[in-house]
Amino acid sequence: MQIILLEKVANLGNLGDIVKVKDGYARNFLIPNRKARRATKEAIAEFEVRRAELEKIAAEKLAASQAVGEKLNGQSFEITQKSGVDGRLFGSVTNGDVAELLKKAGYEVEKLQVRMPEGPLKMIGEHNVQVALHTDVVVDVTINVIGDHA
């Protein structure tokens, strides 16, 4: 399916690009999330009329994400979980737990924005986690997992 992108999409293209994607990806993700529209002649003409407005909105989102990223980058947060004497956690710290921790600290972060390269945290200690605030703004935070010996 040919679509026109209404915002920058990672690994796909930038605002205004006309790309071919699988039908399911377009119908189930891009179009419902208002990231794209079908590339009909009418949609392309309407996009060209609204291009400046959409570029302004995209620039505002990027600026807001960069401002939050500057505050968040390099910060350290602590989370306490039950653990055994060997330092392994009972359960794990997931991206949802990290997102909730960041929300409590005053940052508006969804769990899909939290990237954990090593997977869920299963040991006590300091771990680096990435937060993708925007496709162009990815910051590193440190999560210090403290063991609560049961």
UniProtKB/Swiss-Prot annotation:
One of its GO terms (molecular function) is rRNA binding. GO terms for cellular component: ribonucleoprotein complex; ribosome. SUPFAM superfamilies: L9 N-domain-like, Ribosomal protein L9 C-domain. GO terms for biological process: translation. Pfam families: Ribosomal_L9_C, Ribosomal_L9_N. This is Large ribosomal subunit protein bL9. Belongs to the bacterial ribosomal protein bL9 family. Binds to the 23S rRNA. It comes from Burkholderia cenocepacia (strain HI2424). Keywords: Ribonucleoprotein, Ribosomal protein, RNA-binding, rRNA-binding.
